[in-house]
Amino acid sequence: MKPIKEGKVREIYDNGDSLIMVATDRISCFDVILKNIISKKGTVLTQMSKFWFDLTEDIVPNHMISADVKDMPEFFQQPAYDGNSMMCRKLTMLPIECIVRGYITGSGWASYQKNGTVCGIKLPEGLQESDKLPEPIYTPSTKAEIGDHDENISFEQSVDVLEKEFPGKGKEYAEKLRDYTIALYKKCADYALKKGIIIADTKFEFGLDENGNIVLGDEMLTPDSSRFWPAKGYEPGHGQPSFDKQFARDWLKENEGNHDWELPEDVAKKTIDKYLEAYELLTGEKLK
């Protein structure tokens, strides 16, 4: 079988009335696919998404049908697809990346230092890097093609983007995306904190099912789509150690111009070790 779509990390196969989404062991940073293959990474992404989808189906329906290859066509019943594949409902994806920030870090911190705002949202004075925000903030962005960068937009602009594609529905969809995003973040951040992990920020993607209902799609709260920090030793005032690909990003930044988009073996190994540690802390299980 050949995928109908290949993303930076995922391959999507058409399965008639459903899709099979395979998370590969590729890693991308700064919208570039690195040369490394990070063993087990795809399985962590798929199994972590499954865990969160199960935990949050009371808030919003999601696209997962099954993460068991026994439920999938014979082609997927081989070791290369076991654990990293998910059968999903077909959705019409909405053209917005739904980003939620509970802590000030990364590009949000850089923006706040300049003008006291993050994506146009005014924040209290006197915040330090990595501070918890009084309330999580919703900062949507556009979806970029591979090689391009997503662009931050205001809530009002997200209404316009959705209205253009779904006339008469822009405001309704934008409000639902915002409300679902905040509700999902709050529930999962509370859960994660009890397990020793701070979810600093994350992104969700949503689509419409055949009846026009909003459904959570793509991946959910993985180390690829989120910033995970250890709660132990958390201290505002500087950057935090992380359980996500920030470790790989930091190495690339520090070695700019000298890496040709490839991580040294020890950095690649440390990256997957962090992914596995996050998975085990959050789910209470070792990855099979």
Question: Would you name each region that the model predicts?
Answer:
Residues M1-E145, N258-K288:
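Active-site loop/lid in soluble adenylation, ligation, and acyl-transfer enzymes
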Residues S18, M93-P95, G196-I199, N211-I214:
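Coil-to-beta-strand transition motifs
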Residues F30, W109-A110, N211, S225-R227:
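Intrinsically disordered, low-complexity acidic/polar segments
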Residues D58-H63, K187-I199, G212, T283-K288:
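Surface-exposed helix-capping loop/turn segments at secondary-structure junctions
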Residues V100, I199-M220:
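Conserved metal-phosphate-binding beta-hairpin within the catalytic cores
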Residues K114-N115, L123-E172, L216, M220-L282:
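Anionic ligand-binding catalytic core segments
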Residues F166-A200:
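A long amphipathic alpha-helix within ATP-dependent nucleotide-binding catalytic cores
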